[in-house]
């Protein structure tokens, strides 16, 4: 859990912004969203595999685009 110390004479908005930023860096909101509903282990693995395939395809397309530009 991210903790921030409110500085002296610091506006509430600034402290809230710092807290939100620290929560985002810690990945708390995405973790809460992923744990909101139960997901079967097979579904988790399937989604992870699909994202890995998508990342790989994106990487290959970037490499191919770089090769095409060289000619």
From Swiss-Prot:
The UniProt record lists the keyword Disulfide bond: no
GO BP annotations listed: translation
GO cellular component assignments: ribonucleoprotein complex; ribosome
Basic residues bias (residue ranges): 48-59
Keyword set, alphabetical order: Ribonucleoprotein, Ribosomal protein
UniProt family annotation: Belongs to the bacterial ribosomal protein bS21 family.
Disordered: annotated segments: 48-71
Disulfide bridge positions per record: none
GO terms, molecular function: structural constituent of ribosome
Gene3D superfamilies: Ribosomal protein S8
Keyword Phosphoprotein: no
One matching Pfam family: Ribosomal_S21
Taxonomic classification: Bacteria, Pseudomonadati, Pseudomonadota, Gammaproteobacteria, Aeromonadales
Top-rank lineage group of the source organism: Bacteria
Protein name, UniProt field: Small ribosomal subunit protein bS21
Record InterPro entries: Ribosomal_bS21, Ribosomal_bS21_CS, Ribosomal_bS21_sf
Residue ranges, compositional bias (Basic and acidic residues): 60-71
Natural source organism: Aeromonas hydrophila subsp. hydrophila (strain ATCC 7966 / DSM 30187 / BCRC 13018 / CCUG 14551 / JCM 1027 / KCTC 2358 / NCIMB 9240 / NCTC 8049)
